[in-house]
């Protein structure tokens, strides 16, 4: 089967049905279809409304703290001895990750639609914290579904969500991780369609969620593009981001899609290795199927049953990926590689000791490949990596992995 040709105009995607080529779409229960269609119309209206956009920009600036800096990682650049490495510092946002960008956009949309109750799913807890934060800011009740496994390994974020007034509901079905939390959130949504808004955190789910999340996260790439032009006088040779569902990556990639000279590189979680059954690399080791309302690459067995994903990083522990990433993979516009748990831990330590920045385990996966990419590109070239979250939430996981007690 030949890969589809690259389009001349990426703005043509998704189509009216939310399809990126053969991916995306709206695969939802009959009871949800009217709500999903209403959401699509409401988002299209909001996107075209200058007042909504101005309101979002104001909150991004004065509440979230945007723009985030673009930082030259001088010591890491010297360490690897190749291209100049820049970090897009989205871990400096309010709440400590890129998740606030999307949470702000969607809460404003939910209020515009007259919704009075917010639900969300979370893996690492960062999206849960961001959702609880905006619900506290705007005075809306918040329920966050979180896998029981993730509740245990992300206790600081569970406490933060509770402190912000959210109710955290542990989900013990399956492996008790992000997929299972999303399943429970979808069930809640079906039951409470009239007053409840489901604030999805990743660039997946039924249309219009993948495009909404992409648009709200594209502030990352838009800022990075402007900042690197100001600092270096040209575009980077590569931009790199970690990928679970793919929201931070598509946010970085999208403003560079039309710049064919810029390589787009996504880094999946290889867990114990992609040759084992303990990984979360759905593009590397999966095939197309339908999950959580959209068609995309998924980890599945010969019978089409979803295989449980594994990663040391709770935010990458998902058996699928956003449909736009599946599309970019198939047309060859973006490249996707992977990083094991062990490699991510080494990168976590390296960034901490060389740059004085403790990254989240999610972007540590990207950093583990950035050194090789910088060496491959060579001196005089530029690579920009999205440092999408800070590592406070991961210190217990890292300490346990390193055999240390806190």
From Swiss-Prot:
Class in the EC hierarchy, top level: lyase
SUPFAM superfamilies: Tryptophan synthase beta subunit-like PLP-dependent enzymes (SSF53686)
EC number: 4.2.1.20
GO cellular component: a single term: cytoplasm
Modified residues (N6-(pyridoxal phosphate)lysine): 99
Keywords attached to this entry: Amino-acid biosynthesis, Aromatic amino acid biosynthesis, Lyase, Pyridoxal phosphate, Tryptophan biosynthesis
Domain of life (superkingdom): Bacteria
Pathway linked to the protein: Amino-acid biosynthesis; L-tryptophan biosynthesis; L-tryptophan from chorismate: step 5/5
Protein name as it appears in the record: Tryptophan synthase beta chain
């Amino acid at each position: 089967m030949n890969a589809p040709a690259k389009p001349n105009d990426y703005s043509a995607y998704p189509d009216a049905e939310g399809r990126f080529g053969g991916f995306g779409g709206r695969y939802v229960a009959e009871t949800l279809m009217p709500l999903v269609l209403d959401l699509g119309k409401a988002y299209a209206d909001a996107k075209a409304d200058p007042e909504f956009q101005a309101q979002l920009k104001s909150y991004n600036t004065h509440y979230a703290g945007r723009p985030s800096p673009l930082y030259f990682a001088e010591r890491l650049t010297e360490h690897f001895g190749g291209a100049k490495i820049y970090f897009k510092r989205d871990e400096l946002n309010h709440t400590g990750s890129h998740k606030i960008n999307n949470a702000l956009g969607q809460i404003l949309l939910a209020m515009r639609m007259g919704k009075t109750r917010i639900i969300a799913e979370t893996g690492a807890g960062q999206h849960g914290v961001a959702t609880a934060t905006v619900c506290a800011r705007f005075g809306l009740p918040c329920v966050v579904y979180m896998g029981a496994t993730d509740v245990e390994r992300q206790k600081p974020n569970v406490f933060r969500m509770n402190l912000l007034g959210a109710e955290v509901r542990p989900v013990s079905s399956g492996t008790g991780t992000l997929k299972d939390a999303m399943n429970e959130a979808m069930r809640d949504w079906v039951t409470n369609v009239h007053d409840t808004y489901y604030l999805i955190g990743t660039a997946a789910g039924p249309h219009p969620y993948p495009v909404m999340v992409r648009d709200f996260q594209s502030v990352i790439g838009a800022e990075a593009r402007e900042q690197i032009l100001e600092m270096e006088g040209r575009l980077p040779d590569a931009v790199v981001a970690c990928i679970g569902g793919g929201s931070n990556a598509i946010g970085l990639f999208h403003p560079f899609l039309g710049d064919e000279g810029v390589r787009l590189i996504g880094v999946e979680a290889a867990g114990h290795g992609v040759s084992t059954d303990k990984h979360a690399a759905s593009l590397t080791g999966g095939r197309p199927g339908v999950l959580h309302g959209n068609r995309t690459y998924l980890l599945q067995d010969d019978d089409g049953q979803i295989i449980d994903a594994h990663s040391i990083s709770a935010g990458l522990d998902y058996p699928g990926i956003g449909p736009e990433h599946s599309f970019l993979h198939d047309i060859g516009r973006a490249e996707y590689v992977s990083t094991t748990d062990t490699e991510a831990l080494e990168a976590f330590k390296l960034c901490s000791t060389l740059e004085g920045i403790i990254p989240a385990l999610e972007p540590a996966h990207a950093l583990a490949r950035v050194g090789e990419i910088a060496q491959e590109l060579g001196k005089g070239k530029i690579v920009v990596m999205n440092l999408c979250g800070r590592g406070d939430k991961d210190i217990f996981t890292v300490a346990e992995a390193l055999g240390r007690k806190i």
